[in-house]
Amino acid sequence: ASHPESRCSPTVDGDKIYVSSGFGDLACIDGNAGNILWSLKASETYKGTYGSWGIAESLIIDGEKLYFTTGGLETMTIAINKKTGELIWKTESLNVPASYSSPILLNYEGYRLLVNVSPVYVYGVDVTNGSILWKINHMEALGKEDDGKGSQILCVTPLWHNNKILFTGGYNHGSVMIDLTDNGKKASVAWTNTDFDVHHGGVVLVDGYIYGSNWINNGNGNWCCVDWNTGKMMWEEQWKCKGSVIFADGMIYLYEE
């Protein structure tokens, strides 16, 4: 990676600020004084691996825990004490690098899950002990060939609603809807859509429909609307460039790149 400094949004918890560098170095900073309270070379310590553009994950605070995706052969995700930086648990390895997306934390029928994306899998972690409850091979679901290097560039945070999780990735990759059952301990593929492949700009869900821009090339993409329940493309509006989307006050705002 050629981006050693922080590439993520900082996470604020009270008067503490938590950040990760592009190399996976974590730090807790006093928000009042600006001094570093603790730091951890997380990727180096836990033999993490990541893509050519470095670490871009925004950190999640959950009670006393801070979650970070290392990737690599030793573990996939770790939980550390937010006050000290000491390890609480680490998951098994999925033998793939970290992606560029940020995880989500969800409560489903009394179960608490951390869900994130790797270049090969979407996976769910039991936050009480770090066990990986399920993993969905999105490459296989979309009929893509894995190059064995985990080189897929995936940036979009998964979207959670009711009992379903939407994964999407650009570069002609596509989208996978994942259905959770058994208190979130089991997962299966509900539908796939190879035309809705969101690059960087994220997605929003409004009244049962997903909105975002697909990827044609790095400079072009179309605005799309997809049915949340079926994956059907409702419309695709030709445009000059892909971009970001947000919903507020009954309006969908599209911001092209």
Model-derived segments and spans:
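Repetitive beta-architecture junctions, highlighting loop-to-beta-strand starts
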Residues: 24, 75, 112, 120, ...
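Short loop/turn segments that connect beta-strands within beta-propeller blades
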Residues: 30-34, 41, 81-84, 126-130, ...
